[in-house]
From Swiss-Prot:
Region described as Disordered: spans on this chain: 1-58
Family: Belongs to the universal ribosomal protein uL15 family.
Keywords of this entry: Ribonucleoprotein, Ribosomal protein, RNA-binding, rRNA-binding
Keyword Ribonucleoprotein: yes
Family annotation (PROSITE patterns): RIBOSOMAL_L15
Database matches in PANTHER family: 50S RIBOSOMAL PROTEIN L15 (PTHR12934), LARGE RIBOSOMAL SUBUNIT PROTEIN UL15M (PTHR12934:SF11)
Main function: Binds to the 23S rRNA.
One MF annotation (Gene Ontology) recorded for this entry: rRNA binding
GO cellular component, as recorded: cytosolic large ribosomal subunit
Entry protein name: Large ribosomal subunit protein uL15
Lineage: Bacteria, Bacillati, Bacillota, Tissierellia, Tissierellales
Length: 149
């Protein structure tokens, strides 16, 4: 095969842009695919998104729900079953957890919270901003220490 034998892949050819409003002979003259007169035939014409022709639109027919709490605390939540990958007797801080890829620092604006799902088999010293009661119990039962920072 040589360069002069190469052909574009089937369906991969670049189609020419439709040039509308360029005379009757082109097949796309006169109304240029916009139909007859009206708001949509004009330059910049058309109705806003959600407009239903004057009928009460769906977004106004449905009630508002809830609110966003701008003061909500945002913790990175980590289960104790995930901490078994660390060595016995190791001290674990939020920085170590972030470097190990447990969470992205941007997602943990208010720190790290340790949750009690799963079991822990290593004696670890864990420093975090919050602990659930079950997590605290399981860590101390395994011989580890809990430090709130």
């Amino acid at each position: 095969m040589k360069l002069h034998n190469l052909r574009p892949a089937k369906g991969g050819e670049v189609k020419a842009r439709k040039r509308v409003g360029r005379g009757y002979g082109s097949g796309l003259g006169h109304n240029a695919g916009r139909g007859r007169d009206g708001q949509n035939s004009r330059s910049g014409g058309g109705v806003r998104p959600g407009f239903e022709g004057g009928q009460m639109p769906l977004f106004r027919r449905l009630p508002k729900r809830g609110f966003k709490n701008h003061f909500a605390k945002q913790y990175a939540e980590i289960n104790i079953r995930d901490l078994n990958c660390f060595e016995d007797g190791e001290e674990i801080t939020p920085e170590i957890l972030a470097n190990a890829g447990f969470f992205k620092p941007a997602k943990a604006k208010d720190g790290v919270k340790i949750l009690g799902d799963g079991e822990i088999t290593k004696k670890l010293t864990i420093k975090a901003n919050k602990f659930t009661k079950s997590a605290e119990e399981k860590i101390t039962k395994a011989g580890g220490k809990v430090e709130v920072i």
